[in-house]
Amino acid sequence: MRANFCLFIFILLFSCGQTYNTDNEETQFLNDFVEDDTTIEKTPLKTIKINTDAGREIVDEPKISAFFQIFQGENLIEEHNIGIEIRGSSSQYFPKKSYGFETWDEAGEDLDVSLAGYPEEEDWILYGPFSDKSLIRNVLIYRLSNLVGRYATKTSFYNLQINGVFLGLYVLMEKIKRDKNRVNISKNRSDDISGGYIIKIDKITGDGDTLNEKIAFMSEYTKDGIKGINKNVHFLYEYPKNRDISDEQKNYIQGYMRDFEDAIASENFTSESDGYKKYIDVDSFIDFFILNEITRNVDAYRISTFMHKDINEKLKMGPIWDFNIAFGNADYCEGGLTTGWAYKFNEACPADGMLVPFWWDRLMQDPNFTQALKERWTSLRLNELSNSSIMGIVDELVGELEDSDAITQNFGKWLILGTYIWPNNFVGNRHSEEITYLKEWIEGRLSWMDQEISKF
């Protein structure tokens, strides 16, 4: 309810005078809010240009046909036929949209291509950072995930132009799907239905926005671990898609999740042979926990939460997804604090419509799990997740944007520095202030986690 209320207020504010520089002209805003570094020679980002057939407006379903090009300056690098649509949930309320698109052949059929040097595929995303005025939160956490050995989508910064209109900074990303270069699990075949599967805990979008057995199944435990249907935790079929998954496959993955939940809810849940370890890859759960907790992601464990299972293997968490309101960028449900655990969301916002599954509380009650978590944390803090490692990536990403003048161009288009955009916990007048806040928040968060995990 609170999220919907905030979105309503957001829309109301923007309908009452919020303006954008749609022509990308020079404005006093640039002098007031973006650092003056005009004496430094810039190397512009590559530009993606998309032109829809007959200039049609891009909508949220169905995808419409368009022509996609990548330019370096005036030089054309590559071009493709695509089908494109608006994507996202709450982000669709923002004037700066994000897009999902497929690369197509001339007949409009899916076509795998090595887009921008990425491994061949046909499903892609153009993410437009808006409420995240650092511009780098998603890219940062995906880099960190890959650094600790957990696949996360590849990312690249681009300027975007659609039908001749400049739209600012975007991130070209891989869509999460089953593929040897993405979520590397086997195709689900009729001769062995033990895998692969991708399921996710998420909001219901599409299909009439109605929770039904065609698209999802529900947890059989309440947030407190009591047996009973829980409409606050439901599992969506991601692979095979709900239109493709057979009843036999549904029964298998539903049964597997039911057995896992029964095991972790049982009195002997720590048993090596009959407890939760029989069903899950513990190391993947630990890494997923760490990546979500260092960001205190307010959506963690309950929204945009992916899991996957391969043939004859245990359930694994991940890949991680959607951290634009993480790293202290949420002003509700304690999302802006550097203290407290994200997995304790249910205590902060018990009336929310999307709650954290009871498993995480249960896992943290197992001394063997917390000891393994402590050992993994200690190792990562000495290397991949050290302060210097994380700050080095932040500086690298910001440097790339500064060197290309992308920051000035983006905030020349979208005049939002110094303005609250839902659900900002901090509002900086300059981009550099947003980065300083991000760095200080991360350092505070890491310090708190060091102290708490040392007590395990």
What are these regions (language model features)?
Residues 4-13:
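Sec-dependent N-terminal signal peptides
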Residues 15-40:
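Bacterial Sec-dependent N-terminal signal peptides
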Residues 44-45, 56-58, 78-82, 88-90, ...:
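Middle-to-C-terminal accessory/interaction subdomains
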Residues 60-61, 111-115, 137-138, 170-172, ...:
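Short, solvent-exposed loop/turn and secondary-structure capping segments
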Residues 70-72, 76-123, 127-130, 249:
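Conserved oxyanion/phosphate-binding beta-strand-loop segments in alpha/beta enzyme cores
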Residues 105-108, 119-121, 128, 149-151, ...:
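Internal "kinase-insert"/substrate-recognition segments embedded within catalytic cores
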Residues 130-150:
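A conserved alpha-helical element in kinase catalytic cores
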Residues 148-159, 297:
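Short, well-structured beta-strand/strand-turn elements
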